[in-house]
Design a protein with these regions (language model features):
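Long, hydrophobic/aromatic-enriched structural stretches that serve as scaffold segments
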Residues: 1-35
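Residue-level detector of alpha-helical recognition elements and their boundaries
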Residues: 2, 21, 40-41, 150
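Alpha-helical solenoid scaffolds that mediate protein-protein interactions
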Residues: 6, 25, 32-33, 39, ...
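Short, glycine/acidic-rich hinge or "gate" loops at secondary-structure transitions
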Residues: 18, 36-47, 190-198
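Secondary-shell segments that build the walls of catalytic and ion/ligand-binding clefts
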Residues: 50-213
Length: 213
């Protein structure tokens, strides 16, 4: 669904929105890669358990914030208690956004994945991470990001509503999507060769466009 939305945004001349979705696919790629790098057995099972528990962590944290600003102190305390139970259950002192992975931030997760890869694949992950950081700079509400969205040629990535700039989002998205699809096909016991070939052809095509600039 994310990739379909991304393609529609590119088709209609909105590469900035597409780049935002490409970032999401890269984040999914990193999350899957962390699980892939984790050894099989008890440790990995525990990580999966934490990942699913994070649903309630994020829910309680958001409800807690809503209650705080609504002046509902009793409900706020109830959510604090639920979060305390989860901290105790999983023996963690803080429930950061990526606590379940054992890393404090998304950057730490990226570095972990890079450290656990080698050869050409490692080079690809590093390049994707650079593209991700570049996308973040382009989309954040900073002076650079705002100028970029207006189509400032000095920003190097044209994200104004034109025919240009689509390739950056598509390149990052497809390369990230390849890993997501590969793991999904494997877990479902499906043959991945045909889809892998087509996705790699797309990745090569988009990469060739970005390299011409």
């Amino acid at each position: 669904m994310t990739l379909r939305e991304l393609i529609l945004l590119c088709k209609n001349g909105f590469p900035d929105g597409a780049l935002g979705l490409a970032r999401n696919l890269f984040e999914q790629f990193i999350i899957i890669s962390v699980f892939e790098a984790q050894c099989e057995g008890v440790d990995r099972d525990r990580m999966v358990e934490k990942y699913y528990a994070d649903y309630n962590v994020q829910r309680y944290k958001n409800l807690n914030t809503m209650c705080r600003y609504a002046g509902q102190k009793e409900k706020m305390q109830d959510y604090e208690n639920e979060l305390a139970k989860l901290r105790k259950q999983f023996s963690v002192s803080k429930l950061k956004d990526y606590w379940w992975s054992g890393h404090y931030s998304f950057t730490d997760m990226c570095e972990y994945v890079i450290e656990h890869t080698d050869g050409n694949y490692k080079t690809m992950v590093i390049n994707l991470y650079f593209a991700y950081k570049r996308a973040c700079c382009s989309l954040h509400a900073s002076n650079f990001g705002n100028a970029n969205r207006l189509g400032n040629c000095l920003a190097t990535i044209d994200l104004s509503p034109l025919d240009e700039g689509q390739e950056y989002a598509l390149d990052l998205a497809i390369k990230s999507f390849i890993m997501v699809v590969a793991v999904m096909y494997r877990e479902l016991g499906m043959d991945y060769k045909k889809s892998n070939k087509k996705l790699n052809q797309l990745a090569t095509f988009y990469q060739s466009i970005t390299q011409k600039e």
